[in-house]
């Protein structure tokens, strides 16, 4: 359901809903449009006083600077495009004097576009493992079955909405054709990033966990035993997200549906498979 002149701005809602219920749901989502983002600039990031990713690098370790790899023309253009995008949203900063330096890795996605990552192998080796417990996937899925109405939520570039500790930022420096940069936010590929994300979500939804929401890192499902309760359940979750400035990605969210994909399983009111 498109909600704006811009066709990129839309909500995915239950196809089987009666017209009047569907329209009421759209109006409800429009009233809460501030918790969604269609561009990274619209995601201000979570307050670092609430959550911040720390590397905890062993101070006795000698920093490693990798020599620059030779990139193909296509890969070079992909990296430059990624740098431009990340600079625009304030996710990276140019660095001149550094001790750690890593290379970029460019891989082709299924849609034919390029994914640019940073090879943090050396850095990750000297970071201790964060033992924060992740939920059991089978238990989460089983607990979702049996609910007539569900909404599946996904944050907009959720990892980038988590700040990286100031003392650790320069350790994430990487080489590009247009200079060296470091991350200001938690990047994919950093050790313990998943644990930090889960810690944030567990802390954020502490009062709701086990009730009307299930969370596994960046996958969320809001579930209601009664259809009449679902709007109220969503309202509560939206208020928490709004309070922490965590923005959602509408293209990966679906609202008030009877079934959906959760952690690789198709979940319905009757079963998961």
Protein language model features and the residues they cover:
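Retroelement reverse transcriptase polymerase core
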Residues: 2-273
